[in-house]
Amino acid sequence: RKVIFNAMCLFGILCCGLSVRAQLPNGLDFTSAAEKTVHCVVHIRCEATVQSVFYDDFFSFFLSPQARERSYETSGSGVIVSEDGYIITNNHVVQDAETINVVLNDKRSFSARLVGNDPASDLAVIKIEAEGLDAIEYGNSDDVRVGEWVLAVGNPFNLTSTVTAGIVSAKARDINILGNKMSNAPIESFIQTDAVINPGNSGGALVNLRGELV
C-alpha cells in the first residue's frame, strides 16, 4: 500500500508539472537567453575600510572616544558591456571600495578599477584588463511590455551565475529606493519585475527572452 501511495503521489506531481508546462505559451524557452547571458554577468567583490568610534565607559572618563578602522567586504554583480573589459554595475556595489575584484563565469579573476559613477542613477562603470570577453547585447527598454517574460541574472548570496524568471510587473516606477541612505540619489523610471532578486543580484542583468539587456 505504501508503494502504491508513493507512486500515486509521484504521478500527481508529474501531472502537476505537465499541466503547468501546458499552460506556457508555445515556443516559450528560457534556456537560450540564459545560456547567452550567464557568460556576460560577473561576480564583483569589494573591500573597504570604515572608521567606527570606540566607546569605553572607563577610558571615556579620562579620554575622548577613540576611532578605529574596520574592514568589511561587499559583493554584487556586473554586466560586461565591451569585449575589452568595461563592466556596468550599481554604484552602491562599488561605492567607497578600496579594492575591486571581478570573477568571470569561467572562474578567471581580475582586479578592477573604477572608471566612473553616478550616485543619482546608482550606476557605475568599472574596467578589467582583459580582451575577447563576451559582451552583452542591448535591447530597448522602451519596447518592453508589461507582462513580458524577463530573466534576472546575477550572483545572489555569492551563488554565481544564478538565473531567475518572471514578468515585467510595471514600467516607469518612480521611487527613492536609496532615500534612507542617500537623500540626493533618487532612482526614477525603472522596470519592476517579480523575478526573484536577492542580495548579491545588485548590478546584474535583466534580459528579455532574446538575451538582450533591458
Put a short name on every predicted segment:
Residues 5-6, 49:
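General helical structural elements
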Residues 22-214:
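Serine-dependent protease modules
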